[in-house]
């Protein structure tokens, strides 16, 4: 029921949206739509306009950004999206890589790393795996 209300409200609001607005302004306008957050709005702008003025931040990009020390600990995409996005875009510019390429590569690589390895990277004292059974001594003697 709530989704249908969001959709109906969004459809009405889309009619008055300035589709010629600069990329960030368009993203911000999209976040005013019911049920649309900055990640979704950035995804729309990035893919509709092939924009490198916004970035699509999620947990994978956040983890990679923390590993590279471009995102400080304690910041979340839910509460600090624009601050993290600014840091990400500055980093992309500093290394002369399009933001769209950088977040795509980071996302593809980070999502393939097993959770146990990510825990170990975040906390060097964390166990990489927990054995389920006692190890068995094998013998090759005939």
PLM region spans:
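Alpha-helical ds-nucleic-acid-binding substructure associated with the helix-hairpin-helix region
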Residues: 1-34
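Alpha-helix N-cap and coil->helix boundary residues
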Residues: 2, 21, 25, 56, ...
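A residue-level signal for conserved active-site and pocket-lining positions in enzyme catalytic cores
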Residues: 7, 61, 102
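A basic, often C-terminal nucleic-acid-binding module that engages the phosphate backbone, implemented
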Residues: 12, 78-142
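Phosphate-backbone recognition surface of nucleic-acid-processing proteins
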Residues: 45-95
């Amino acid at each position: 029921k709530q989704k249908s209300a969001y959709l109906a409200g969004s459809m009405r609001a889309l009619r008055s949206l300035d589709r010629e607005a600069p990329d960030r302004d368009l993203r911000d306008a999209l976040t005013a739509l019911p049920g649309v957050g900055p990640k979704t709005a950035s995804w729309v702008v990035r893919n509709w306009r092939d924009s490198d003025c916004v970035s699509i931040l999620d947990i994978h990009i956040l983890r990679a950004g923390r590993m590279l020390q471009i995102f400080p600990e304690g910041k979340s995409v839910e509460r600090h999206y624009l601050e993290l996005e600014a840091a990400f875009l500055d980093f992309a510019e500093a290394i002369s890589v399009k933001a769209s390429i950088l977040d795509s590569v980071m996302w593809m690589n980070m999502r393939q790393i097993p959770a146990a390895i990510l825990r170990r990277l975040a906390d060097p004292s964390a166990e990489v795996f927990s054995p389920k059974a006692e190890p068995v001594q094998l013998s090759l003697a005939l």
